Amino acid sequence: MAVANQPRTLAEKVWSDHVVVSGSGEGAAREPDLIYIDLHLVHEVTSPQAFDGLRLAGRPVRRPDLTIATEDHNVPTVDIDKPIADPVSRTQVETLRRNCEEFGIRLHPMGDVEQGIVHIIGPQLGLTQPGTTVVCGDSHTSTHGAFGALAMGIGTSEVEHVLATQTLPLRPFKTMAVNVDGELPPGVSAKDVILAVIAKIGTGGGQGHVIEYRGSAIESLSMEGRMTICNMSIEAGARAGMIAPDETTFEFLKGRPHAPQGADWDAAVEAWKLLRTDEGAQFDTEVYIDAASLSPFVTWGTNPGQGVPLSDSVPDPEMIFDEGERSAVEKALAYMDLRPGTPMREIPVDAVFVGSCTNGRIEDLRVVADVLRGRTVADDVRMLVVPGSMRVRAQAEAEGLGEIFTAAGAEWRQAGCSMCLGMNPDQLAPGERCASTSNRNFEGRQGKGGRTHLVSPAVAAATAVRGTLSSPADLTAEPTR
């Protein structure tokens, strides 16, 4: 972290604004800073033990007004008016409801108009704002960094600490700049950008860092695209990801339920405009990517860094000289049941999943609908389209997108995390292969024995139509209707 009166990065500015008590000592022996938390997001999976800890200690929630809960990970995306069938999932959801009632926390339960994936409803409600600190017991809290917030996932013991004190002891992070300059080619999305970034720096490349995404290509993205970028910072090993707020940010936030109003809005925007990295500020690490060189990107392996352009082929481990890396590639190919040299476009899929906190927003659904309009999903492919929130679903319905999905043969579901992870009924069967707009392709992530290829919404939709990994450019035939 920069010292006082020196140029500072965006992350350093937000950090220093939230230090309650500075840690003593120097270097590795330095004690953590105590950081104030502006927004605490809660869901059913990582919170039960935290509330139990409060109960045992006789403590209240310090700031219930800065805490908001929703049900997302374990909820079904069909028959939401019926009891949850799985007993573990049902218990977690019921426990969250009891805890929120007991401790006075606002909850958006399954079926509520504001219910949805926690990282989608925060920005949707205007709760996520520039210059704030945001935490949640979930890895992909980094999503909120798209607004210039310092947002990070925390463990269950830390969830309890924030509930009890509204603070968190943290050691300062290193800083990394990922500069993406130039103009993105047609058909290249934010998802392709972040998959290319992770392939370049590796899944451990950002370890211990807060990544700030910069450059003209980043500035050209919508807020939804920026959220996709920041969402997957954790897949690069980073603690958080951030993008400096600008007019795009302000336009997205203006008028949302929890955004400042009137004179308060004007004052907030003036303050938010200062949330930029100072000229001359030093990053610990810098990465440069030419936007014009990017193309649709897909993963072939079992971690998000094992990816290539869609135009490439499955890598050959015999061409890798590092023994450890070669062994990892061989293991991934065996699990994925892929042969080296196979063109990525020739890989067939059994399922396509559109959704998650990475790509479950209205902009993503519009892209998918544009590809599916007048076309049909391949006969041997099952396609699930799952909105990230009930608000997103309602907007999609109002725009006629739901009709496009169902006419094409896709399943149009209710809001939830769905097939992103195997914690609810939406799962792959062993051996099934899925093109997924989610963020993780670990072994068994979408169900035991399932095989996952991470893709953008456009690639997901084209893949559903052709039955093999594809981009919309591969759909040469005109729509049939």
UniProtKB/Swiss-Prot annotation:
Binds 1 [4Fe-4S] cluster per subunit. One of its GO terms (molecular function) is metal ion binding. CDD domains: IPMI (cd01583). Keywords: 4Fe-4S, Amino-acid biosynthesis, Branched-chain amino acid biosynthesis, Iron, Iron-sulfur, Leucine biosynthesis, Lyase, Metal-binding. [4Fe-4S] cluster binds at residues 357, 417, 420. It is an enzyme of class 4 (lyase). Its EC number is 4.2.1.33. Its cofactor is [4Fe-4S] cluster. Heterodimer of LeuC and LeuD. Catalyzes the isomerization between 2-isopropylmalate and 3-isopropylmalate, via the formation of 2-isopropylmaleate. This is 3-isopropylmalate dehydratase large subunit. The gene is leuC.
